[in-house]
Amino acid sequence: MGVKFKDITNPEPIEMKELEGKILTVDASNVIYKFLSSMRQTDGTPLRDLNGHITSHLNGIMFQTSTLIEKDIKPVYVFDGKAPDLKKETQEERINIKKESEKKYLEAKEVGDVVAARKYAARTTHLNKEIIKSSKKLLDLMGIPYVQARTEGEAQASYMVSQNDAWAVVSQDYDCLQFGATRMIRNLKLSKSNSKNLELISLEKTLKELNLTREQLVDVAMLVGTDFNKGVYGIGAKKGIKLIHKYGTLEKALESLNETMEVDAELIREIFLNPNVVHNYTIEFKRPKKSQLLDFLCGEHDFDERRTISAIKKLQAKTAQSSLEDWF
């Protein structure tokens, strides 16, 4: 979910054409989750092949990524590794929410409430090993690079942007700012009706407007609540900023409120400010493997062959074996 920083950021509208020629790191879990949630049948169930395997994520990756490549926008997917131990409670809460949504989905389905059934079905979405494995296989066949993070995918994606190996992170979560991404892109959707909502958030601009350092932004996040701590009841982002402006640090702000942290703040600072990232990664766009793509998508997963060939042609037209130096 990330930190609720929507009210304190001032995003700039950006046109899709401004992303042409740029490498973008993509928070794979975030994006694949959206594909699984949104690409569903009328009864709320995900898209499946004739053998019952879920294919919503493959559909999204293949057709949306090929369209990005056609527009000369170069995505690099970054996959989550092992979550920090401090995230365990957040993960358990999400599991409970999904269980409750599953219950409400079945109830809505039983009474024939299609709208409610679809809404609650989307909330049951989860990523399993098979979905991640098939996503990586598809990207390999498409010639699209991906990086396996050690821990948080957002941290790795943000690090790659901070090193100027990519221009921006594509994610809905504001955690990228705490992780040090110099730029993040929100609402990257390919339909014309949604393209007007495309947003660019600059870390430098955000910190300047808020009169905060990145370290202080992390302190504000902890006051509000992160994936690693609950935060202080009643403290939103704006109030958190006022407290940090007044007291300078999280510890002094907590003391003024007569509050304490349930976890060591230094551990959370370490996650955001010095994340465990992969330094030796390769960004290389290759030509798609047409015959293997057709076998995988059309043969194994019953995709429409004509539509799949069209997507492959988009990839072939824009990609050739090339190293990172060639793209920049």
Swiss-Prot record:
Region N-domain, residue ranges: 1-98
How does the cofactor bind to this protein, according to its record? Binds 2 magnesium ions per subunit. They probably participate in the reaction catalyzed by the enzyme. May bind an additional third magnesium ion after substrate binding.
Return the annotated region ranges for I-domain: 116-248
Q: Enumerate the residue ranges of region (Interaction with PCNA).
A: 320-328
Is this entry keyworded Magnesium? yes
One GO MF term: magnesium ion binding
EC id: 3.1.-.-
Q: Which residues bind Mg(2+) 2?
A: 173, 175, 227
Q: Where is the signal peptide?
A: none
Query: Has keyword DNA repair?
Result: yes
So which cofactors does this thing need?
Mg(2+)
Give, as one word, the top-level EC class. Answer: hydrolase
Q: Which UniProt keywords apply?
A: DNA damage, DNA repair, DNA replication, Endonuclease, Exonuclease, Hydrolase, Magnesium, Metal-binding, Nuclease
Query: Which InterPro entries does the annotation name?
Result: 5-3_exonuclease, 5-3_exonuclease_C_sf, Flap_endonuc, Flap_endonuc_arc, HhH2, PIN-like_dom_sf, XPG-I_dom, XPG/Rad2
Please report which protein family the annotation says this sequence is part of.
Answer: Belongs to the XPG/RAD2 endonuclease family. FEN1 subfamily.
Function per UniProt: Structure-specific nuclease with 5'-flap endonuclease and 5'-3' exonuclease activities involved in DNA replication and repair. During DNA replication, cleaves the 5'-overhanging flap structure that is generated by displacement synthesis when DNA polymerase encounters the 5'-end of a downstream Okazaki fragment. Binds the unpaired 3'-DNA end and kinks the DNA to facilitate 5' cleavage specificity. Cleaves one nucleotide into the double-stranded DNA from the junction in flap DNA, leaving a nick for ligation. Also involved in the base excision repair (BER) pathway.
Q: What is this protein called?
A: Flap endonuclease 1
- This protein's encoding gene: fen
